[in-house]
Regions:
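Short, low-complexity N-terminal intrinsically disordered segments enriched in polar/charged residues
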Residues: 1-2
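Short, contiguous alpha-helical
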Residues: 5-19, 24-66, 103-150
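Helix-adjacent hinge/juxtasegments
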Residues: 54-55, 59-92
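Acidic catalytic patch
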Residues: 91-104
């Protein structure tokens, strides 16, 4: 396994670690600035992965669920993020020495793009939960930064 693939795996586990710490009812929490609720943020993360897989390697889409707004559950999100995470991992693993179709400049930048995009949404999720009076516990807050144990 390459360092890039391992980095992606850690990042995906952190997304799921956060999701597991959120009560199902709080998936509907919304930040003061509106936009997507917590569940829709996680759904967006999954669906953007699918969008990129469709461009870069459509064969990796087989069996991957797109999460629609009216079908958001914690279980569905965890399953979808695990499955799409494995597909992105495979895409990165197969592209380490080269390029990702439809993305410039290379696979390392693609990984950086994904981690930046999804971390941005993790921040929005944390803010929405806090502003709604449902912040995740302190152990989880610190745990998001413990890449060496995730």
């Amino acid at each position: 396994m390459s360092a890039l693939t391992e980095t992606w795996q850690i990042h995906n586990r952190i997304n799921i670690y956060l999701l597991e710490a959120i009560d199902e009812a709080n998936l509907k929490d919304l930040s003061a600035s509106k936009g997507r609720n917590v569940g829709e943020q996680f759904s967006h993360i999954n669906n953007v992965r699918l969008m990129w897989l469709k461009v870069a390697d459509p064969t990796l889409l087989d069996g991957l669920p797109k999460i629609e707004k009216d079908h958001i559950t914690k279980e569905a999100l965890i399953d979808a993020l695990n499955l799409s995470g494995k597909a992105i991992e495979q895409l990165i693993d197969e592209s380490i020495s080269g390029k990702i179709k439809g993305f410039k400049p290379h696979a390392t930048a693609f990984l950086g793009y994904f981690i930046s995009h999804e971390s941005h949404h993790r921040g929005q999720i944390m803010l929405a939960l806090k502003q709604s009076g449902h912040p995740v516990d302190q152990k989880t807050q610190y745990g998001l930064w413990e890449w060496g144990v995730r």
